[in-house]
Amino acid sequence: MPKISSSFDAGAISVIDSTDSQNIRLALRGDNAASFSQWFYFRLQGAAYQPCRIRIENAGQSSYPEGWEDYQATASYDRSNWFRVPTRYEDGVLTIEHTPLAGSVYYAYFEPYSHEQHLNLLGDAQGSGLCQIDDLGSTAQGRDLNLLTIGHQAASDLKIWIIARQHPGESMAEWFAEGLLSRLLDHQDPTARALLDCATFYIVPNMNPDGAALGNQRTNAAGADLNREWQNPSPERSPEVYAVRQKMHETGVDLFLDIHGEEALPYVFAAGCEGNPSYDARLAALETAFKTALRQASPDFQDEYGYPKTAPGQANLAIAKSYVGETFGCLSYTLEMPFKDNINLPDDDFGWNGQRSLRLGEAILSAILAVCPQLRPDETA
């Protein structure tokens, strides 16, 4: 008889009935302390070579039901190699149809990035000899919140801050961080060397380790959406934002990137600070220059489709990119990657995945280097 389980790092699903491989009935499980639901990650055993129909019956009540349209679930036999499987969304039900070729197979909303991978990422970064790892404090459940500092930390250095995975179900964000770190810590990469001659990087590859381990889609263990906590974070409800924001005020910020995943739109795009009260022509020109450079660095990035522009002065300053952009008067972006495929460069077998996220992380360093000379206002003007 088929068995469904999810008692592992980031696992998340509720089982209604798994006795019939042709009618496995499941339900999305909400975040541990909030009503958000979208992420799923579970294991199926005992159905090798059997045509399986897996129905997630409450998909229509998820946080982003439009995210299921033209979506294909991911699957893996070894949790290292993930591929897309036939999936359809009808009448509020997400149906996965797949014939497993082994007795154990995993299904997930997107290719996961585990806590073990996170710890290995920190270890590899430290082993490069270029990276200082600092403890910013502990999460609500006692997990470490680490900051990676790369550069000479000279007073004159540009201060570049990059955070990822405020929303824990957006695992592509940490894949992106891995790619960025891999290139930045490459002693032989000329772009990385040029950047570290003029800038110090402050990188938080996982802002929400509790939520990631719990299998949450959007919130931390206390039920807080971290990307709505930046104006008034607290050590109790949002210790992650509280600690990172405090460190930012110590270092200053010249460029800020907040890395995310987007459920509905099948594109890579950026959202800027046009709605901030202090937004001006200099920042508008910087945004344009950065997007142009990123398009040149990676054909996966585009600027035709994205979120609607925010009206002048109407930005929500509780959102990270808006708060940081307004507070420090700097170039500040949210970068979004799709849970679906990138419709401009589709891949039927793998869709948008961890490796493509990683490659985008590598590419963004070229865009950062291109705008470095423009990041600070001309003090002599």
Question: Predicted segments — roles?
Answer:
Residues 130-150, 155-317, 322-325, 332-337, ...:
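Active-site/substrate-binding loop(s) of hydrolase catalytic cores
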Residues 64-65, 108, 115-118, 170-172, ...:
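Short helix/loop capping segments that flank catalytic or ligand/cofactor-binding pockets
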Residues 58, 111, 164:
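A short beta-strand motif that forms part of the nucleic acid-binding face
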Residues 1-101, 105:
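Extreme N-terminal flexible tails
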Residues 40-44, 122, 290, 294, ...:
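Short, Φ-rich (hydrophobic/aromatic) sequence segments
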Residues 344-381:
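His/Asp/Glu-rich mid-to-C-terminal helical/loop segments that flank catalytic regions of hydrolases
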Residues 11, 87, 137, 357-363:
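Glycine-centered structural positions embedded in regular secondary structure
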Residues 88-137:
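Extended acidic/polar, glycine-enriched regions
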